[in-house]
């Protein structure tokens, strides 16, 4: 295994040479309810974390597929969560716009935001392509590599499903 000398892999912090932690956060969902990464991740065998923004056509185009995945995931002890980059810091206009897009797309899964200066906020700002989707296990570890690009693309959903299957196989909760 090639782990960089600083022990940092893909923007998170490492628990050991094989795992990368998703940055911990406390924030709110788009309805103003408190959300913490600890409770979110520990409550699910896997969490699909999708980074998107409101004016990104491929991002908006996959919201329906992500909602269908969320409904399917619930039966397997998992969830889908969205992080809209425009809502970092709790900008009221951006939150209203995101809620409008989600409603029009029929997406009912939770979307969260947090302080832009937090570790998770910095992680979000370092996402270089949208949409980008991560799978996080019950312990807050990122599973495999992120899916870059819409999950509606060729092979993307299969790759995402493989990460979910890995998280489920490794779940010790």
In which residue ranges do the predicted regions lie?
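N-proximal helix/coil linker or "cap" segments that precede and/or mark the start of modular domains
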Residues: 1-26, 41-44, 96-100
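A short beta-strand-turn-helix
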Residues: 24-47, 71-72
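Loop/turn elements at helix/coil->beta-strand transitions in domains of secreted/extracellular proteins
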Residues: 42-47, 74-81, 105-110, 138-141
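Solvent-exposed loop/turn segments at secondary-structure junctions
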Residues: 53-58, 85-90, 115-120, 129, ...
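Structural microenvironment flanking redox-active thiols in thiol-disulfide oxidoreductases
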Residues: 60-104, 116-121
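Short, internal strand/loop/helix patches
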Residues: 97-139, 147
């Amino acid at each position: 295994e090639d782990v960089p000398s600083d022990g940092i892999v893909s923007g998170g912090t490492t628990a050991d040479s094989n795992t990368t932690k998703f940055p911990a956060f406390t924030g709110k969902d788009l309805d103003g309810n408190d959300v913490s990464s600890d409770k979110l991740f520990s409550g699910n065998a896997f969490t699909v974390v999708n980074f998107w923004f409101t004016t990104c056509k491929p991002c908006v185009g996959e919201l329906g597929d992500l909602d269908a995945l969320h409904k399917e995931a619930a039966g397997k002890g998992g969830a889908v969560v969205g992080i809209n980059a425009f809502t970092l810091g709790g900008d009221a206009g951006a939150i209203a716009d995101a809620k409008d897009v989600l409603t029009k797309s029929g997406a009912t899964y939770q979307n969260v935001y947090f302080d832009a200066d937090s570790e998770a906020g910095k992680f979000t700002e370092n996402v270089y392509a949208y949409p980008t989707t991560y799978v996080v296990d019950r312990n807050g570890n990122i599973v495999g590599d992120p899916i870059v690009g819409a999950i509606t693309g060729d092979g993307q959903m299969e790759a995402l499903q493989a990460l979910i299957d890995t998280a489920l196989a490794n779940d010790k909760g």
